[in-house]
Every structure is written in structure tokens, then in C-alpha cells.
Curated annotation (Swiss-Prot):
Protein known as: Myosin-1
Keywords from the named record: Actin-binding, ATP-binding, Cytoplasm, Cytoskeleton, Hydrolase, Motor protein, Myosin, Nucleotide-binding, Phosphoprotein, Repeat, SH3 domain
Function: Type-I myosin implicated in the organization of the actin cytoskeleton. Required for proper actin cytoskeleton polarization. At the cell cortex, assembles in patch-like structures together with proteins from the actin-polymerizing machinery and promotes actin assembly. Functions as actin nucleation-promoting factor (NPF) for the Arp2/3 complex.
Organism annotation: Lodderomyces elongisporus (strain ATCC 11503 / CBS 2605 / JCM 1781 / NBRC 1676 / NRRL YB-4239)
Superkingdom, taxonomy of origin: Eukaryota
Posttranslational mods: Phosphorylation of the TEDS site (Ser-371) is required for the polarization of the actin cytoskeleton. Phosphorylation probably activates the myosin-I ATPase activity.
Modified sites of kind Phosphoserine: S371
Domain comment as written in the entry: The myosin motor domain displays actin-stimulated ATPase activity and generates a mechanochemical force. The tail domain participates in molecular interactions that specify the role of the motor domain. It is composed of several tail homology (TH) domains, namely a putative phospholipid-binding myosin tail domain (also named TH1), an Ala- and Pro-rich domain (TH2), followed by an SH3 domain and a C-terminal acidic domain (TH3).
Region feature Actin-binding, mapped onto this chain: 419-502
Domain SH3: 1129-1189
Domain Myosin motor span(s) in chain numbering: 48-736
Length: 1279
């Protein structure tokens, strides 16, 4: 993008940093940078505890537990430790995973919303898009803590926010990803004592995203260590995998007939544990979800039939039972069962019987093949072979389902490089009897804990040391020693190595292999304090607690290889799904021909765990630490001891301590500059990177431009460290709003241009209409006057030439303001024709009538009378009456100049009565009513009659009076009589509208962007001791001299005055002097910034050339000439002795000790005007005391000359005042001889002072221009 620079730009302007946008730590600020309140809009309940454990006052395990307990009992299950999420399983649905809740986390950082798993998912997806880094989430915790549910919700969130509903292929991938949850839960989860939906396998789901749009285009699932032992045996009150109960309870009819499926109580594998039905598990609904997931993923009907055929085969295999024959060997109890199993497997029944009751042994002599023997098995051995067949079938079936799902999810992976990984793996387990499955599960959890330690604790501290960041080291437990105890091979072999060696030594006899393994344990843990050897058992001190493992059967489980007899049996099957898919021919050949030791289960889990660690290390991790609050699986049951134990072994206290002492964000200098260079005008311009220096200096410039305090960051050798997440969020928010602000700036410039064009067009149109058709408001005024012409005395203000009938005086038709508030409050929907304030005469019981203030609003249909009332000490507006215009029969007025009007209806009622009102714009109201209701009668006479109540007439008399009790221009009501002063004759007419004075167009309204207006001074001078009114600021000296005294000089084009002018010189005129000036001189002055390129000049003759400005000297300029003598005020001045509230209509309130003009005295009332002549009205003369003259001492103090020690700014200010005072006095024609002589004598000094002032203003111009965009050629394009 090309850089287009505006002419005359200064370097200071170009490098000025953009204003920091402060929006309350959250997104949602407006384009104009306005501060908006950040609030938690998801829940309105009071925050319980702290949402981030780093905010705890005491960092102890007990304090963490207490905070989690409070939040858990308040149904708040999520808490942060920095960016780590702590989740406590509620064991019930809290309604926090709805689509509405999900949408509230889209595009929000974690501080704007309460802690939630959705916030973690949003953070992962945001960093994937913003930084292009692979993401993963590690969910850890013991079994039943809620890991699987957290993984499901993360998948749901990412699929929802990343998918374009218009792309069918993307939507299909999303649906398939979500469908993997119910499918793999059915085949891989089971009910245990601790968890009704415990994952009995590990799963790492990797969702791949497209470049640019970051939408899911593929996915891949990695499976880890299925607990296949559960297929054949479970402890009491546990269940087999969910799919067996779903299938047997709700099997379709065709499968019942084809596969002979019956209820779960029929099969040994589903009924032995005596737990068929579980509260909270709906097997029927789950089975429908499983079938639906199969269809979404794309499993054909044939593939589904094969799956359920294998499930039926496994169930019927478990029902094969044995008895002892005469030789003590195992024999089939019921041949019908084996025959049906052979039917399902598509093998010969006799071959099946031999495979599970006999064992084939081959002997060899060197390279020669030996003899083959068929050894019969006893009942225990035959049962083990039967179970091995069932476990092998289910394990391979599960692996095939995962591969088949991956085949459907592979999509177009060639376009994908970025991914988000979700790890859902079995949690830490401690049972009464722990075997090989538990040591594998706990080993994987140890590896995950090691990743957490390396990536959050150790790596963080190591990085601080490497980057030379100030840091206080914190001790922590590194569990690498436990991982080495299990997986190491050298120098000290671990448990897995010992298991493999035991199998190699005694491979034929499982019991002998267990004994060898028990002997090797003494060498494994000889020097490891985390290991204890017991007889037939051993203890490993895991990070989550001590676990005792049984040696018996561990070596046999580690073999993880099907017997050769079983593989040969499966090879004879006629079912291609079995022989080609589940058990391909190469399995048997590898088992027979391979000279290498077969891969054991420990080898597989170790290999898978290391691959998982490498995968997670290549991504940016997020962490969710789940906590199980009880063992009863009941809601609102919180076991403090159990939770405290988990807090300790999860290391939450150490995590909090490191988090509070560390940094929330770190990045290399290059990446930080690439991300945030837009935030500084020195590094970025219009989206282009323009920095020429090194990255470290660019980082400093960006942080300086964004006003980030040094306490919030540290700079290392290669990275920048941001301490708090709030600072990072502020930087991200400013970056997000950069282009938005640029667009808003262009829009403002365009709207400003359009506004000027519209205003100019309106001005021309208004002048044209007035020339051709006259002023409609004045025409309507003349129409209203004609209605009363010759019949009613008129008030002086009604006959002004500038009086026009504008109608809506309260601005009810505007979109904002008091008038709009009024109509909204009372529910007026129609356009308003007339609105004004006034009073109404209401009678009170037991006393005479009294005036009450009211608001009058007239529409085309109704005349509304609105009252302001106090309700519970709050002012409210209430509609008192709504009088239909077409029902108004007449209006009554007197012949005098009063403002009373009686509005009479055809049939008055209690809700729509006649009213007797008083308002200044009575004539205009009558004219509007007459215009809307042409049949309206206007009754004018010495009395006015109206119905006080329906059927009860009230007559009000009017009389001319005088005296102290009747203020001028104000009437007095008493006992049914209104007394008023004499008014203007009834035949009076309005003179022509006075011509407006010509003046320069004020363009400041086009640049109102939060700075001071041109009409407002940059500061307010202190009022004098005698007066409270604000001072009037003088006109700029340059304009007065150039206009009045040098008309012969050619005009120099000037630039439009700056929007933000420098402060003018303080005025030292007293209010008395200001009052003596003519009206033209007393108008508000412009700021004291001169027009460009025009220096102030003294008055000179035509033949004399102006003297060049003298050079600057260090000597202080001479003091200004003395002020002119104080002239006599044009009106008598009075001091207020008491406060007066001005409650009477037409009066002016008085403030004690304030000076006022008194224009006229009539009895006990005086016509009072404020010193600034903004208010005029009647006030009691007894409250005032006449002043002899203005305070001379105040004036003398105000005109004190500037001393030689005054600074140049003060000198220039005094000089500006002097020039202005002289010019103003010359304009008024009242220049004294003494002042004229002083001016002539000081001609050269004034020229020097004027030049100095011009130079000072020119220097100041560069500063003020930077803060102003009022120039016509400045379109706010400084990016």
C-alpha cells in the first residue's frame, strides 16, 4: 500500500502515538474509543469466592479448597489459575452448555466472561487463527472427575464456531467429528465404581483446519490401550462396555433372529458383575445415538451387520462353559453353544472345540522341524483360552472402528497444516486390587503430569533464567523419577523392562514368569525411594498417591498376543470381515516366522505414550484440571478430604505461586512486532510496516506508544514478557479496532464534507424561500395576531420584530432531549404541533384556587396537559388531561395583556374538563387550535367564563391595576379577579424583522469531535471581587487593526482558524468596563490565535511604510500603558442583600452580595438585569441596596502592570490585552488624550511587541496544529 503524505505534515505529527482505547478490559468498545462498562452478561448472580485462584489473599491448599467449595455449592464449577481451568464435577446438568451460552463466549477473552470450558476452547481457536500455532488441550484428573464431558464440550464449541453453515463439506466434517463421541463412548466407556461413564481407553482427537478460513476439513483419532480385560470380567457393581447392554436390551428384530440376541442377563460377560441397569443411563436412547453416529460417519449397512455379528459372537463365546472329563481335562458342557458360536464365526465346530480345549506344541531341533503335540487343557486353562478369543475379537474390532472413523474423517488433508488436539484419556486409578491395566493407566497419567510440569513450571522458570528476567525461583516436585522407574531401560531397568525380561525367561509358564518378575523387583527399586517391594506385591508412590499392585497375572497380561491355535482357528473362517479385516493373514505369518520377540503390551503403551508426549510438545497446550468432589457420584456432595488430596497431588498451590510471580504472555521480538506494529505510527503506516531499525527498539516503541507501564512487562534477550493478561488483552483490543478506527475516521471526514454541503444548500434554499414566499413562521405569527387584532391589548415582547411562531418550543419532535423524554414518558406517538411550559389554575378544597406548573403539548388530535409529580421522592411525568381538539368549543381571553386562556369543551367531563391556563405563547396556542379546528370560537371580553366542574361555571374578571403588589408584565390572581398592568394598544403590529449582522461562518460545528469549540475560551479567568458574572474576552488584536486601520493593504488569504486554539491572554477588564462598550464590542470574542501569515500592525499613515519588526532582545518589554479612566455605568447598580428564589413568573432570582443593574423602579418592584445582560426581570426592590460606584480597588488590582520578572508568556498576554483595549476604545470614539499620547510615544515598542507575539504564535502554531483537524485540507488521514 502506497504511503500518501499530506503537504505540510510535521515529523512530530507523524510520530504521534494513537490514543489508547480503554474499554474496561473487554471487547465491545465503540469505534470512537468511548468507555463502555464490561459486565458478566451470562449470569447475574453474585460472584462467590474468586474466579481466579491467583487472586486469593493466602496461597495454601486449605484456602484453595475453601474457595472451590464455596463455588461448588453455588453451582459454579469452573475456576482459573491464570490460563489453567479447574473443573469440579457437579454430577448433574447445570444448564451451562446450551447454544445460547455458547454464543456468549464467541470472540470474547476469558476476562470478559465467567470461567468456563468454552472460554478455553475460544482461546485455543483464537490463537490458532491469530498466531498460526497448533493447539492442544490436556485434560487430566482421576476417574470420574469429568474429563470426557469436558472434551465433548470443547469439540462441540470448536465445531460450532469454526463451521460455515453454507459449506456442505465443512458441515459434514463437523457432524462426523461430533458423531465420534457417542460411537466411541459406547464401545470404549463403561460403568465403574467411581464413574458411570469411565473411559476405558485413551483418545487423542486432532481436528485439522484449512489455511485462511480456519474451518475443519479433516480429523484424526489416535487410540491408546483399550482395557480389553473388561470384556470378560468386571468386579461387582461394575459393567462391561456400554454397547453390550445397549445391543442386548434394544436389539433390532432382524438381529435377534439372525444372531440369537437375548437380554443381558442371559450372558455371562454382562451379568456376572450383577449390574445390568444403572440410574442415569438410558441404554435405549444411547443405542439410537450410536446407530445414528454410525450413519453419520458413513458406515454401510454391511459394515454395521459385521460389527453386531462380532458383538453377538463375543457374547455367546462367554457362555461356553466347561466340565471335567474322566481324565481331569476340560470338556464342553453344552455343544449347542459352541455350535452356535461356530455358526457366528463361520468355522467348523470341531475345529473350534479343539482350539479352546487343546494346545498345540511344536518341538524343533536346530534348523530342523520337530514333532507336533496336542496337549489337553484343564478347565482353568480352557477358560483362559476362551476369554483370550473374546478379548482379541473385541480389541481388534475396536481398533478397526477407530481406523474406519479416521478413513471418513481424513477429508482433504493436503490443504491442512494447523490443528487443535483434544486429549481424553483414562484418569488416575487406585483400586483395592490393582494389576497391569492400572499400572499402564497410571503410567500415562504420570507422563501427562510430567508434561504439565515441564511446560508450565520448569520450562517457565528455565525460560526466565535464559532470558535474564528478574525472577524468584519456586520449588516444585518433578515426577520424572517416577516415570523413569516404570519406563527406563538403562542404566537401571524399569518395571516394563523387568516384565519383558521375565516373559523372555519363562515364556511358556505364566506362573513361573510372575515369580521371575517378583525376583527382579528388588533390583528395579533398590535405590528408588518411590518404590517399595512387598511379597507378591509392590508399591509405587505416584504423584496422586501410593498404589499397591499385584504381581500375579501381570506377565501374562503383558504378552498381549493371541495363541497360535486361535489365530489358526480364525484363519479358517469363511467370513471375510474376520479373515481379511480383523485378523489379516500376515498376523499368523509374523507370529510363526518372526525371529524377534513379539511386541508386548508394555512396549505398545510406552511407545504410544512417548508419541503422545512428542505430539503435545509440538503444540501450544491448554490445561484443564478436573477434580472429583466425592465417591458417591451425588450432586452437592463435597468431600473436603478427598478434594484436598487432589489439590495437593495436582500441585495447584505451586501453580498459583508460579503464576502470581510469572508472566502471562511471552513472545519473540520479531513475532511481537509483526503482531502489534500497527499500534505505533512509528512502526506502521496505513497497514504497511515502515520501521527501519532493529526488533528490540521496535518493541520498545510499540509499548511506549500504547502507554504500557514498565511494571507490566520485561524485555529479555530475545523475548518480551507481558506480566498480566489484562495488558495483553488491551493490546489485542487496540489491534482489533485499528482498521475499524481508520474506517470510522474516513467516514467522519466524508460525513463532515456532506454536512457542509447540506448546510450550504439549506442556507441558499432558506434565502430563496424567504425571498419568494416569505418566512412561514412570521406569516403564521401574523395570522395569529389577526385573530386578536383590535380586540386585546398586547404585551411588549409579543410585538418584537424577531418574534416568530416556532411551535415546538420543547423540541418534542427531536430524537433526543427533554421534549423527546416528555412525549416518551406519557406515550405520545403523534407529531407535536406546539409545546411549551406554563401554569394551570386549580381549585383546592377549603381555599382559593392556586397556580400549578404544567407542560402543554398539542398534536393534531389532542391537547395534552402534563404534570410533574413526585413519586417515592422521584420526579415523574404524568398525563393529567388529554383534551380532544375536535371537542374544543371555544377559547376565552380577556381584553387586557394577560396570558390567561380558558379552553372550553362541548361536553366537559371529570376526565376532559374545561381548563384555565396561563402561558407566554397563548396567542400562538390559540392560532394553532384555530388552524386545527376551524369551528373554534375565540371569545374576548372583560370576563372569561369556563366550567370549573361539569355544570358549575366559574367567571374570572380582569382589571387594570397598578401598585407595588402588581409587578410589571406580570398579572395577579386573587378571589376570581386577575389584575394586570396596562399593555400595548390592541391595534399594535410587529415591525419588520431586524437584519442580522454579517459575520464569518463558524466551521467549528463541523469539527466537533470532543474538543473545545471556537466560541469557548481555552480557560476561564477569575472573576473580579465585585462581580460574579463571567468576563468577556477581547477580540484578537490583529483582526481589529487589519480591518479598521489598514483598509488600503491587500487582503492576504488566511487559513481557517484552528479547531483547538492556544489559550488567549487572560482578560483584565472589569465587568463595569465591559458594560460600557457598545453591543458589537461586547459579543463573545474569538480565541486569541491570529489568522495565519498576518502579523499585528500599529495604525500608520498611508504614505508611511510599516517598520520591520525589531529583533528579539533578552530585555523585558516595557509595561503596558495605564488603563483609561473608569466610566460611569450606563445603569444604576445595586447589590443584593438577600437571596430571592424568583418563584413569581417573569421575575429574576437574586443571589446575595451579587451586583445587578436596575433599569426601572415601579413601587416595590424593580426591573433587574444581570451584569452580563443575559437575564432581565422583576425582583423586590427591598432586597437590593444601591451601590455608589464600582470598586476602584478591584479595578486597580486588575490593571496592575507586569513586572520585569514576569515570564514572556505573561508579557505577551499583557501586550495582547493592551492592543485590544486600545483598538476597542478607538472604535468607540472615546479615546482619551492621555492614552493617545501614550500610544504615539510607544509606537516602535508596540511594533516590537506585536512582532514578538506573532513569532510566539507561529511557534505555538505547530503544536496546536498537531491537535487540530479543523483545516479544510485535513481529512483525518494520519494513519
Amino acid at each position: 500500500m502506497a504511503i500518501v503524505k499530506r503537504g505540510g505534515r510535521t515529523r512530530a505529527k507523524q510520530q504521534q502515538a494513537p490514543a489508547k482505547v480503554n474499554n474496561g478490559l473487554g471487547a465491545g468498545a465503540g469505534a470512537g474509543g468511548g468507555i463502555q462498562k464490561a459486565e458478566f452478561d451470562i449470569t447475574k448472580k453474585k460472584e462467590v469466592g474468586v474466579s481466579d485462584l491467583t487472586l486469593l489473599s493466602k496461597i495454601t491448599d486449605e484456602a484453595i479448597n475453601e474457595n472451590l467449595h464455596k463455588r461448588f455449592m453455588n453451582d459454579t464449577i469452573y475456576t482459573y489459575i491464570g490460563h489453567v481451568l479447574i473443573s469440579v464435577n457437579p454430577f448433574r446438568d447445570l444448564g451451562i452448555y446450551t447454544l445460547e451460552n455458547l454464543n456468549k463466549y464467541k470472540g470474547r477473552n476469558r476476562l470478559e466472561v465467567p470461567p468456563h470450558v468454552f472460554a478455553i476452547a475460544e482461546s485455543m481457536y483464537y490463537h490458532l487463527k491469530s498466531y498460526g500455532e497448533n493447539q492442544c488441550v490436556i485434560i487430566s484428573g482421576e476417574s470420574g472427575a469429568g474429563k470426557t464431558e469436558a472434551a465433548k464440550q470443547i469439540m462441540q464449541y470448536i465445531a460450532n464456531v469454526s463451521v460455515d453453515s453454507g459449506n456442505a463439506e465443512i458441515s459434514k466434517i463437523k457432524d462426523m467429528v461430533l458423531a465420534t463421541n457417542p460411537l466411541l463412548e459406547s464401545f470404549g466407556c463403561a460403568k465403574t465404581l467411581r464413574n458411570n461413564n469411565s473411559s476405558r481407553h485413551g483418545k487423542y482427537l486432532e481436528i485439522k483446519f484449512s489455511e485462511g478460513s480456519y474451518q475443519p476439513i479433516a480429523a484424526h483419532i489416535t487410540n491408546y490401550l483399550l482395557e480389553k480385560q473388561r470384556v470378560v470380567s468386571q468386579i461387582t457393581n461394575e459393567r462391561n462396555f456400554h454397547i453390550f447392554y445397549q445391543f442386548t436390551k434394544h436389539c433390532p428384530p432382524q438381529y435377534q433372529q439372525q444372531f440369537g440376541i437375548q437380554g443381558p442377563e442371559t450372558y455371562v460377560y454382562t451379568s456376572a458383575a450383577k449390574c445390568i441397569t444403572v440410574d442415569g443411563i438410558d441404554d435405549g436412547k444411547d443405542f439410537k445415538d450410536t446407530l445414528n453416529a454410525m450413519n453419520i460417519i458413513g458406515l454401510s449397512q454391511a459394515e454395521q451387520d459385521n460389527i453386531f455379528r462380532i458383538l453377538a459372537l463375543i457374547l455367546w463365546t462367554g457362555n461356553i462353559s466347561f466340565v471335567e472329563d474322566e481324565s481331569g481335562n476340560a470338556a464342553i458342557r453344552d455343544d449347542s453353544v459352541t455350535n452356535f458360536v461356530a455358526y457366528l464365526l463361520d468355522v467348523n465346530a470341531e475345529i473350534l472345540k479343539k482350539a479352546i480345549t487343546e494346545r498345540t506344541i511344536e518341538t524343533s531341533h536346530g534348523m530342523k522341524r520337530g514333532s507336533t503335540y496336542h496337549v489337553p487343557l484343564n478347565i482353568v486353562q480352557a477358560t483362559a483360552v476362551r476369554d483370550a478369543l473374546a478379548k482379541g475379537l473385541y480389541n481388534n474390532l475396536f481398533d478397526w472402528i477407530v481406523e474406519r472413523v479416521n478413513l471418513s474423517l481424513q477429508g482433504n488433508q493436503g490443504q491442512s497444516e494447523k490443528s487443535i488436539g483434544i486429549l481424553d484419556i483414562y484418569g488416575f486409578e487406585i483400586f483395592e486390587h490393582n494389576s497391569f491395566e492400572q499400572i499402564c493407566i497410571n503410567y500415562v497419567n504420570e507422563k501427562l503430569q510430567q508434561i504439565f510440569i515441564q511446560l508450565t513450571l520448569k520450562a517457565e522458570q528455565d525460560e526466565y533464567v535464559q532470558e535474564q528476567i528478574k525472577w524468584t525461583p519456586i520449588d516444585y516436585f518433578n515426577n520424572k523419577v517416577v516415570c523413569d522407574l516404570i519406563e527406563a531401560t538403562r542404566p537401571q531397568p524399569g518395571l516394563f523392562a523387568a516384565l519383558n525380561d521375565s516373559i523372555k525367561t519363562a515364556h511358556a509358564d505364566s506362573d513361573a514368569a510372575d515369580q521371575v518378575f517378583a525376583q527382579r523387583l528388588s533390583m528395579v527399586g533398590a535405590s528408588n525411594r518411590h518404590f517399595e517391594d512387598r511379597r507378591g506385591k509392590f508399591i509405587i508412590k505416584h504423584y496422586a498417591g501410593d498404589v499397591t499392585y499385584d504381581v500375579a497375572g501381570m506377565t501374562d497380561k503383558n504378552k498381549d498376543a493371541m495363541l497360535r491355535d486361535l489365530l489358526e482357528l480364525l484363519g479358517t473362517s469363511s467370513n471375510a470381515f474376520v479373515t481379511q479385516t480383523l485378523f489379516p493373514p500376515n498376523l499368523l505369518s509374523e507370529l510363526v516366522d518372526s525371529k524377534k520377540r513379539p511386541e508386548t503390551a508394555s512396549d505398545k503403551i510406552k511407545k504410544s505414550a512417548n508419541i503422545l508426549v512428542d505430539t503435545l510438545s509440538q503444540a501450544t497446550p491448554s490445561y484443564i484440571r478436573t477434580i472429583k468432589p466425592n465417591q458417591t457420584k451425588k450432586p452437592r456432595d463435597y468431600d473436603n478430604q478427598q478434594v484436598l488430596h487432589q489439590i495437593k497431588y495436582l500441585g495447584l498451590k505451586e501453580n498459583v505461586r508460579i503464576r502470581r510471580a510469572g508472566f502471562a504472555y511471552r513472545s519473540t521480538f520479531q513475532r511481537f512486532v509483526q503482531r502489534f506494529y500497527l499500534l505505533s505510527p512509528a512502526t506502521g503506516y496505513a497497514g504497511d510496516y515502515i520501521w527501519q531499525g532493529d526488533d528490540l527498539t521496535a518493541v520498545k516503541e510499540i509499548l511506549r506508544a500504547c502507554h504500557i507501564p514498565t511494571s507490566e512487562y520485561q524485555l529479555g534477550t530475545t523475548k518480551v514478557f507481558i506480566k498480566t493478561p489484562e495488558t495483553l488483552f488491551a493490546l489485542e483490543d487496540m489491534r482489533d479496532k485499528y482498521w475499524h478506527n481508520m474506517a470510522a475516521r474516513i467516514q467522519r471526514a466524508w460525513r463532515r464534507y456532506i454536512k457542509r454541503k447540506e448546510d450550504a444548500a439549506k442556507t441558499i434554499q432558506r434565502a430563496w424561500r424567504m425571498k419568494n414566499h416569505g418566512n412561514q413562521f412570521e406569516q403564521f405569527r401574523d395570522y395569529g395576531n389577526s385573530l386578536l387584532q383590535g380586540r386585546k391589548e398586547r404585551r411588549r415582547f409579543s410585538m418584537l420584530g424577531s418574534r416568530a411562531y416556532m411551535g415546538d418550543y420543547l423540541a418534542c419532535n427531536d430524537k433526543t432531549g427533554f421534549g423527546r423524554f416528555v412525549v416518551n414518558q406519557v406515550g405520545i406517538k403523534e407529531p407535536v404541533v406546539f409545546s411549551a411550559k406554563g401554569v394551570i389554575l386549580l381549585s383546592k378544597f377549603g381555599r382559593s384556587s392556586k397556580r400549578f406548573p404544567r407542560i402543554f403539548v398539542l398534536t393534531k388530535s389532542n391537547l395534552y396537559i402534563i404534570a410533574e409529580v413526585l413519586v417515592e421522592k422521584r420526579l415523574q411525568l404524568q398525563r393529567e388531561f388529554a383534551l380532544p381538539v375536535h371537542l374544543i368549543k371555544s377559547v376565552g381571553l380577556s381584553q387586557l395583556q394577560d396570558n390567561w386562556v380558558a379552553v372550553c369543551l362541548l361536553s366537559p367531563t371529570t376526565t376532559t374538563p374545561d381548563v384555565f391556563i396561563n402561558l407566554d405563547f397563548k396567542t400562538e396556542l390559540v392560532a394553532q387550535l384555530k388552524k386545527l379546528n376551524s369551528g373554534l370560537s375565540i371569545l374576548i371580553g372583560p370576563t372569561v367564563q369556563y366550567q370549573k366542574k361539569p355544570g358549575k361555571y366559574q367567571t374570572v374578571k380582569f382589571a387594570i391595576g397598578s401598585g407595588p403588589h402588581i409587578p410589571p408584565l406580570i398579572d395577579s390572581y386573587k378571589s376570581g379577579t386577575v389584575t394586570v398592568n396596562q399593555g400595548l394598544p390592541p391595534t399594535s403590529k410587529n415591525p419588520k424583522r431586524p437584519r442580522a449582522k454579517l459575520g464569518k461562518v463558524d466551521y467549528s460545528k463541523y469539527y466537533n469531535r470532543g474538543v473545545r469549540s471556537l466560541a469557548q475560551p481555552a480557560f476561564q479567568s477569575q472573576p473580579t471581587a465585585s462581580y460574579r458574572s463571567e468576563p468577556a474576552y477581547p477580540q484578537p488584536t490583529t483582526q481589529l487593526y487589519a480591518t479598521q486601520h489598514q483598509p488600503q493593504q491587500p487582503q492576504v488569504p488566511t487559513r481557517t482558524a484552528s479547531r483547538k486554539a492556544p489559550p488567549p491572554a487572560p482578560s483584565t477588564q472589569t465587568a463595569a468596563q465591559v458594560s460600557t462598550l457598545p453591543q458589537a464590542a461586547r459579543k463573545p470574542a474569538a480565541p486569541a490565535r491570529p489568522a495565519k501569515k498576518i502579523a499585528p500592525q500599529p495604525p500608520v499613515k498611508k504614505a508611511v511604510s510599516p517598520q520591520p519588526p525589531a529583533k528579539k532582545t533578552v530585555a523585558a518589554p516595557p509595561p503596558p500603558p495605564p488603563p483609561p479612566a473608569l466610566s460611569k455605568p450606563k445603569h444604576p447598580t445595586y447589590r443584593a442583600m438577600y437571596d430571592y428564589d424568583g418563584s413569581v413568573a417573569g421575575s429574576v432570582p437574586l443571589v446575595k452580595d451579587t451586583i445587578y443593574y436596575v433599569l426601572q423602579i415601579n413601587g416595590k418592584w424593580g426591573l433587574v438585569k444581570t451584569m452580563d445582560e443575559t437575564q432581565e426581570g422583576w425582583s423586590p426592590i427591598d432586597y437590593l441596596q444601591e451601590e455608589s460606584s464600582p470598586s476602584a480597588s478591584a479595578a486597580t488590582q486588575s490593571y496592575a502592570p507586569t513586572t520585569a520578572s514576569s515570564n514572556p508568556v505573561s508579557t505577551a498576554s499583557s501586550n495582547t490585552y493592551t492592543n485590544t483595549t486600545q483598538a476597542t476604545t478607538m472604535l468607540n470614539g472615546s479615546l482619551g488624550n492621555g492614552l493617545a499620547d501614550a500610544l504615539k510615544a510607544k509606537k516602535s515598542e508596540e511594533t516590537t511587541l506585536a512582532g514578538s507575539l506573532a513569532d510566539a504564535l507561529k511557534k505555538r502554531q505547530g503544536v496546536t496544529r498537531d491537535d487540530s483537524d479543523a483545516e479544510d485540507d485535513d481529512d483525518d488521514d494520519d494513519w
